[in-house]
C-alpha cells in the first residue's frame, strides 16, 4: 500500500463517526417501496451530500406520470459528480438504492431507529442498501479531501436511486437512457466478503383463470375457476421439478426456480368461483433465454387449460428482469477491487467472486455494455444481515472496510487511467 492509499485509509478511519451519523439519518428517513413515496428521502439525501461537500450534487426529477405507472407515489434520483484532473480518464459510476421493503413484523428494535448494539447498526434498509450509499459517498469524499502524491484523472459519479424494489426502470436504466450517466465502469451495491459478477434474471406472470359462477347447490351449472387453477398449479409444481435439472456453470447460482407467491379468487362460500388469479415468479439462470422461457411457460399453461371445457385463461407478463453477467474476472475493475480487498481485509485467500440467485440494478449497467461488479457493505451471505427480514443489520467494521476498499480501488483506476 503506497502513501496515498495509506492516507485514504487513515482519513476514512478518522471520519468513522460522521459515516455512522450519515447512515443513521438515512435509516431514520422512511423510504418503504411499496408504497413508494421516495421523493422525501431523495431530497434529504441531496441536502446531506451538499452539507458534506460532495461536488455537483443534483436532484434529478422523473416525470410524474411515469412514476405513477410503476405504482410508486413519488420519486427522484440523486447524482453527485466529481472530476479529477482534466476528467479525461475513466468515468466510474457508484450506484446504490435507497428505497426499501416495508419492515414487516418481528422486530426487536425500532426499524427506523438506526440503533447500534454490539458493533452493529439495526434498521430497515441499513444493509439493503443505505450502507452502500454511505460507503460510496465517503470513499469519494476521501479522494477529494486527501492530498495525493500521484495525480488522479477521470470522473466518479454517485448515482443514488429509489426504485430498485420495483425494478429500477426509473433509476439506473432511466439515468443511462437519458444520458445523465455515461459510465465506463460501474460498482453497484453488494457485499464486503465477496464480489458478485453475475445474477439471475426473473419473469413475473399473472395468470387469470375465468370460469362461470353458479349457486353452490348447483355446481354443475357453473365452471369452477379455482378447480381449473388447481390443475394449472399442479402442472407448474411438476414443471418446477424439471427446472432443477438445469444447472448453471456459474459459482453461486444453482438452477432455475419457480414460485407461486399469490393466489386470489372466489366470491363467497356458497358461490361457484368464476375467477381465480395467481402470481408466479420464474427465476432465470444467466444461461437461459428469457423469451424462450416465457414461451415454454405459456405453452405449459395453455396445454393444461385446453383440456378443461369452458375455461378461459389470460396470461400477463408483469416483469422481465434480465440476468447480469458473468463479467470476466480479468477486467481491470475486478482486478483492482480484488487486489485492494486482499490488502485491507484480514481474510485468508483471495476475494471470492461469484454469482447470486437474486436480481438487482446491476443488470441495467450490464445491458448497456458497462463492465460492472457488485460490491459494498454486508456479510458473507445476505441472511446474516437479515436483509428484507426483521432486525436487518450491518457490522460497522464492514462499513469501514468496504469504504476503504472502494476508495483504494477508485484510486487505482483513476491513477492508471484504465477505462
Cite the ranges covered by each PLM segment.
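Acidic/His- and Gly-rich active-site-bordering loop/insert found
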Residues: 2-121, 145-152, 360
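Acidic/histidine-rich catalytic neighborhood of metal-dependent amide-processing enzymes
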Residues: 121, 129-202, 418-419
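Hydrophobic/aromatic beta-strand patches that form the interior of the parallel beta-sheet core
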Residues: 58, 92-94, 159, 185-187, ...
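Beta-strand segments within the central parallel beta-sheet cores of soluble alpha/beta enzyme folds
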Residues: 59-60, 153-161, 187, 248, ...
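Glycine/charged-rich beta-loop-alpha catalytic/anionic-binding loops adjacent to active sites
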Residues: 111-125, 210-211, 386-388
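Metal-dependent amide/peptide-bond hydrolase catalytic core
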Residues: 2-7, 196-198, 204-419
Amino acid at each position: 500500500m503506497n502513501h496515498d492509499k495509506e492516507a485514504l485509509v487513515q482519513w476514512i478511519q478518522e471520519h468513522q463517526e460522521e459515516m455512522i451519523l450519515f447512515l443513521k439519518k438515512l435509516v431514520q428517513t422512511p423510504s418503504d417501496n411499496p408504497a413508494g413515496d421516495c421523493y422525501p428521502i431523495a431530497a434529504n439525501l441531496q441536502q446531506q451530500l451538499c452539507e458534506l461537500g460532495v461536488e455537483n450534487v443534483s436532484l434529478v426529477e422523473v416525470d410524474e406520470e411515469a412514476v405513477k405507472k410503476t405504482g410508486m407515489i413519488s420519486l427522484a434520483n440523486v447524482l453527485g459528480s466529481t472530476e479529477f484532473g482534466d476528467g479525461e480518464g475513466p468515468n466510474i459510476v457508484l450506484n446504490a438504492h435507497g428505497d426499501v421493503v416495508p419492515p414487516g413484523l418481528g422486530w426487536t428494535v425500532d426499524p427506523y431507529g438506526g440503533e447500534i448494539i454490539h458493533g452493529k447498526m439495526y434498521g430497515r434498509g441499513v444493509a439493503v442498501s443505505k450502507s452502500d450509499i454511505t460507503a460510496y459517498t465517503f470513499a469519494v469524499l476521501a479522494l477529494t479531501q486527501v492530498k495525493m502524491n500521484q495525480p488522479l484523472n477521470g470522473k466518479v459519479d454517485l448515482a443514488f436511486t429509489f426504485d430498485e424494489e420495483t425494478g429500477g426502470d426509473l433509476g439506473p436504466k432511466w439515468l443511462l437512457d437519458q444520458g445523465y450517466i455515461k459510465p465506463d465502469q460501474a460498482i453497484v451495491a453488494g457485499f464486503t466478503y465477496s464480489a458478485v459478477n453475475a445474477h439471475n434474471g426473473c419473469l413475473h406472470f399473472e395468470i387469470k383463470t375465468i370460469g362461470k359462477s353458479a349457486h353452490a347447490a348447483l355446481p354443475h351449472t357453473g365452471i369452477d375457476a379455482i378447480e381449473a387453477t388447481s390443475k394449472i398449479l399442479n402442472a407448474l409444481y411438476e414443471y418446477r421439478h424439471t427446472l432443477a435439472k438445469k444447472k448453471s456453470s456459474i459459482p453461486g447460482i444453482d438452477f432455475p426456480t419457480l414460485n407461486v407467491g399469490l393466489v386470489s379468487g372466489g366470491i363467497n362460500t356458497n358461490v361457484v368461483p368464476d375467477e381465480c388469479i395467481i402470481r408466479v415468479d420464474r427465476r432465470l439462470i444467466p444461461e437461459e433465454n428469457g423469451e424462450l422461457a416465457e414461451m415454454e411457460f405459456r405453452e405449459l399453461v395453455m396445454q393444461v387449460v385446453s383440456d378443461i371445457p369452458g375455461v378461459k385463461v389470460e396470461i400477463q407478463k408483469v416483469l422481465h428482469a434480465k440476468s447480469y453477467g458473468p463479467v470476466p474476472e480479468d477486467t481491470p475493475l475486478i482486478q483492482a477491487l480484488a487486489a485492494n480487498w486482499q490488502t485491507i481485509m484480514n481474510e485468508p485467500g483471495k476475494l471470492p467472486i461469484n454469482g447470486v440467485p437474486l436480481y438487482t440494478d446491476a443488470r441495467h449497467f450490464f445491458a448497456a455494455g458497462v463492465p460492472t461488479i457488485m460490491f459494498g457493505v454486508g456479510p458473507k451471505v445476505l441472511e446474516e444481515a437479515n436483509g428484507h427480514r426483521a432486525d436487518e443489520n450491518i457490522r460497522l467494521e464492514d462499513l469501514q472496510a468496504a469504504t476503504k476498499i472502494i476508495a483504494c480501488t477508485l484510486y487505482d483506476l483513476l491513477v492508471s487511467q484504465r477505462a
